[in-house]
């Protein structure tokens, strides 16, 4: 059933799309918000960006079944989510992170980096880096949607995913 309003922000007719994957995952991936396919199917990263992400995970030896994948905002937004929606979504995301307890969190895109770590960080200057904040370590990469569409970003994304593969193997 698709709710008429989001319980958090009250602004959407789209469905709640929870995170999915291995609840004991050592690796967690966090994106921005569900797109049309995710809204339709009720699962994160199942549309074109998700298919691209799956291909890149497989290419570096990471099985999607072994990770937890979620979004900052749990419902589709038309355009980037605003600060108010992100602010109302963060408590649920923080609860999700505490529940999964990943060893490494991959932040997919600027919205995830700014919402989860700090507004002073950005994908353009911090991609491919590990950021330690609080109890967790974060690895910053471009969003797969941008990597799919822009050749320059795709090249950076693929390089960062090779680094992620090394980090992932170190997790065991």
Regions found by a protein language model. Name each.
Residues 1-48, 59, 134, 168, ...:
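Active-site and ligand/interface coordination hotspots across diverse enzymes
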Residues 11, 64-65, 72-172:
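Glycine/proline-rich loop-helix segments at beta-alpha junctions forming the active-site rim
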Residues 16-20, 57-58, 95-96, 128-129:
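Short, flexible, glycine/charge-rich loop motifs used to bind or transfer phosphoryl groups or to couple energy/partner
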Residues 33-34, 71-73:
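Short, small-residue-rich loop/turn micro-motifs
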Residues 44-52, 86-87:
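Glycine-rich anion/phosphate-binding loops
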Residues 54-62:
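A short, N-terminal amphipathic alpha-helix
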